[in-house]
Amino acid sequence: MTCCEGWTSCNGFSLLILILLGVVINCIPLGISLVEADSTSQNPISCYEWWFPGIIGAGLMAIPATTMSLAARKRACCNNKTGMFLSSLFSVITVVGAVYCMLVSLQALLEGPLICNTQANSTVTCEFSLKNLSKFDPESFNLLWFFNGTCVSPTDFKNPTINNMVSNWKIPNSNSEEDRHRIFHFSVFMSLLLVGILELLFGLSQILIGFLGCLCGVSQRRSQIV
């Protein structure tokens, strides 16, 4: 097995683990919303999980590249120049899905849970729209809704100074419902963000390795000596 095949196999196993993690993490808030909410249209904690960043972005869109990468370990029909090229091509889909998962997670972390929303816990701010994702402002990404002592939407802070931000930072505990919502929202979407980042790195590396494997070739089966 060449270096390209070994790295491709490692990428396949890594992507498989990340797919499972992304799907499970995304399903946790969905399950809670189905159990606690009277209807499935609103979640008392959040609503960004209904954009399915872990199920679609980090899950379904990474399956083709994962399948092709794992096939390299078996030295089957996929273990040739064409197979390596396809693994590189399918990894582009993985990269797109990982970016989608990251953008949704960043948007969710920017807005905070519904209990921190100033519009009476409305789901309007997280209505599905690619335009909303394109409006992400890195400068407003400060997580004040999580680290501040009180749950206030980041948009309610006007030009906060660094000293004020540091002095008001406080890790929420689970003593109140508000803090539990903040901790749960932060944990879920920070985890999905990390899954998306890792999938992006593995996807980019597989694009490079698959391209090199396509150019340099792969190992052949040794003929059995009878």
Curated annotation (Swiss-Prot):
InterPro entries: L6_membrane. It comes from the Eukaryota. The record marks F13, S14 as: Cleavage. Residues 1-14, 71-83, 213-226 are lumenal. GO terms for cellular component: endoplasmic reticulum membrane; focal adhesion; plasma membrane. The keyword Cytoplasm does not apply. Residues 36-49, 105-191 are cytoplasmic. Keywords: Endoplasmic reticulum, Membrane, Transmembrane, Transmembrane helix. Its main location: membrane. Glycosylated at Asn-132, Asn-148 and Asn-163 in presence of ceramide which inverts the orientation of TM4SF20 in membranes exposing these residues to the endoplasmic reticulum lumen. Cleaved by signal peptidase at Ser-14 but the peptide does not act as a signal peptide. Cleavage is inhibited by ceramide which inverts the orientation of TM4SF20 in membranes exposing the N-terminus to the cytosol and not to the endoplasmic reticulum lumen. Coiled coil: none annotated. It is found in: Membrane; Endoplasmic reticulum membrane. The chain crosses the membrane at residues 15-35, 50-70, 84-104, 192-212. Polytopic transmembrane protein. Inhibits regulated intramembrane proteolysis (RIP) of CREB3L1, inhibiting its activation and the induction of collagen synthesis. In response to ceramide, which alters TM4SF20 membrane topology, stimulates RIP activation of CREB3L1. Ceramide reverses the direction through which transmembrane helices are translocated into the endoplasmic reticulum membrane during translation of TM4SF20, this mechanism is called 'regulated alternative translocation' (RAT) and regulates the function of the transmembrane protein. Belongs to the L6 tetraspanin family. The first transmembrane helix plays a critical role for the insertion orientation in the endoplasmic reticulum membrane. PANTHER family: TRANSMEMBRANE 4 L6 FAMILY MEMBER 1-RELATED, TRANSMEMBRANE 4 L6 FAMILY MEMBER 20. This is Transmembrane 4 L6 family member 20. The lineage of its organism: Eukaryota, Metazoa, Chordata, Craniata, Vertebrata. The gene is Tm4sf20.
